[in-house]
Amino acid sequence: MAIQWFSSSDNDPERYELLRRSFELGWIAEDTRPSMPDAATVKTKWNNDEAIMLPDILADVIDRYSTDLEQSHKLMERTLNGEEIAPKIEAEPYASRLNPKFPLLSAVFEEHDEQCIEKLFFDAEENGEVIGEDLWCKASWLSFDDNDASMRFRFSFGMEGYEDVAADPERQMLASELTDAIFPESAAITEHPELNKLLAEMVGAKPAYTERIIYFNAPNGGAQMHHDVERGHLGVVFAQMSGSTGWLAMAKPVLIDEIQAFLELPESEAALAKVLPDIDSQNALRELAEDRAALSCHMDEFDHELSEALMDRCPEFIKHLFDRGYGYILKPGDVLLMPQRDLETCVWHTVFCTSEDPGEALSFALRRID
């Protein structure tokens, strides 16, 4: 077993705490580092909708971007301290990388989005002509928890949540270039020969990286169990650049299998009662779990509290998933690939910060260039 789950640290410095939004979900340790899979294995796993870890694949370039990573960390810290982002972006080292192609047009604070910190709008220009409108970089908190400092910088364009971004690949790529200008360490993925060769073989075409997000997962933070399915995207390439994160990742049908299997265990009764004290809620989840289609639909709903309580707040279920071999610990230079073929087969995943300070990671959607 590569990752072991423990109920306490036992003062072992090799164990990482699983603490998120003040929920204590155990401790994990890595028995052995996984080996790098060969290209055939990567392709097979990808086609089978399995998460794939590529350990240390970017280790040879991390030092190359040390200055950029340090600058990005400073931007994150200043944002945490309540400083506005726009004035920083208009100064060096950002100004010379953005201008003249990406002039900053405005910065807003979206009142309708309580997690929004600041949203910056840009146009893309070439020879004085606008070639791409309404590009944006949005800084947001990952949760509403005051004790979770996790944040992200997301890059896209158009009306957030309404625009079919896959229908405009030109603006998608311009938003990707905007990411490069603000976070040059993005090149660790986009310009890495070995990684790009591997991904090209995996998807059967030249890879493109769109809908980019720069994450800073902080202690007591991370992401709850979710998927990242979006039309036109094949999956997600996640690269740990600093700090470390703990993961659980598996295809949705496998996750449903494990929910059903866990609820059949005698010990599930007491475990479930701790996260769903109401007996009617416990019975409702068990009833859902008896019908795969009903459980699958429930998981896709915005409000899926019954399954969320189990997947995100139940230490015994977290242990069950780690014991079953779905866990990963990512360190600087590691990459995790997660297929997102469709809503029925996509890899669901949950993330924990396992470092003492916020760590930076790159999360890029993968699409083909045919």
Segment roles from a protein language model:
Residues 1-337, 341-370:
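N-terminal accessory scaffold of Fe(II)-dependent oxygenases
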